[in-house]
Amino acid sequence: PPDVDSYIQDLLNTERVADLRPDEVVAALMLAENAIVADLGSGPGVFTIPLARQVSRGVVYAVDVEPRQLDALRGRVIDAELNNIVPVLASYTTPHLPPSHVDLILVVDTYRHLEDRANYFQRLRSMLRPGGRLAILEYKPGELPVGPPIVQKLPEGHRAEELRVAGYSLLRTFDMHEYHDFEVWVPSTNF
């Protein structure tokens, strides 16, 4: 967005954050203290900070393509007194994560913004450790009172099909959000 500063404020909007329920999402993911996590499309850190508190002996890679989002995150990390967050400037084709390194990749309200998603998520598989997971939180399809207009969202079933093509199987879904789908995927063994 052209006005990144106002976009950052929108992302940190108290009502939006409350609807996303970051603490509950992080708890549901049952991460070990020493887990290595990537928050893909981290923005100013709505999920990065709760993730970092959960994996207190691990690392959270805060991955974003917008440097000013990462600058906003750095300020919030200093305020939160956390030292296990690594900001990573990504490109639209790769998040720049090491191979076979990450236990969980969390993607919140970012999936629809990625280009060539099947190939992108196929590449992400190589960055997961054995047993690694991909968690996606994305606005539900159709007309909603909040979130992006319907023309910016994927049709029902489209994300699932893309992820299957990219080599993932749906592990489970959580029903804790009124306006978001919350899914956990794992690399398919027969891919």
Which residue ranges define each predicted feature?
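Class I SAM-dependent transferase core
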Residues: 1-32, 36
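A short acidic, Gly/Pro-enriched loop at the edge of an enzyme's catalytic core
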Residues: 95-104
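A short SAM/SAH-binding and catalytic strip from SAM-dependent methyltransferases
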Residues: 103-117
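Core SAM-dependent methyltransferase catalytic element
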Residues: 172-191
